[in-house]
Structure formats: C-alpha cells, structure tokens
C-alpha cells in the first residue's frame, strides 16, 4: 500500500471537502482506495490518499492535484508520499 499527502491552502478549508467529494469518483477510478482530509488550521487542510501501490499513485496524483487546485481555488503548499509501513485500528 502507498500513501500520498497533500497540504492545501485555501480561504475556507471546508469548501475543499466539497471539491474532493465531487472528484472522488474520478480519483477512485484512477485507483485510489480511500481518502481522508484533515483541517490543520484556519486556512489549511491536508489530504491523505491511499493507493494499492506506488505506480498507481504516480500515474494519477499529479493530474488529480492539478484538477483539485483548479476546482477549489486552493493552492498546494506541500506534499509527501511513501510506502505504508503499518496500519493500526
């Protein structure tokens, strides 16, 4: 399993959730298994998307991020990705 994290800056982070919800079918069709979005401050959110493997993530992530930024009016201010080492709960 592989995870991608994207840090977003936007006026109202809750509005970004609406964009993500609209885009979820397309993201899922690209191979995503799940996505979580966390509000990290008044103008920021972090998304975590789980993928079956690194190759699937890399094929999809750049276009999905660009579409998300264009639709939400948000700006990507950081990102990270890597192989999932463990999952609990």
Predicted regions, residues:
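Short S/T/G/P-rich N-terminal loop/turn motif that feeds into the first structured element of a domain
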Residues: 1-48, 52-66, 72-89
């Amino acid at each position: 399993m592989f995870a991608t994290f994207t840090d977003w800056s936007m006026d109202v982070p809750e509005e970004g959730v609406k964009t993500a919800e609209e885009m979820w079918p397309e993201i899922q069709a690209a191979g995503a298994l799940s996505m979580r979005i966390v509000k990290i401050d008044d103008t920021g959110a972090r998304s975590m998307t789980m993928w079956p493997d690194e190759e699937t993530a890399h094929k999809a992530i750049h276009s999905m991020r660009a579409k998300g930024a264009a639709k939400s009016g948000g700006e990507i201010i950081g990102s990270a990705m890597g192989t999932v080492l463990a999952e609990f709960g």
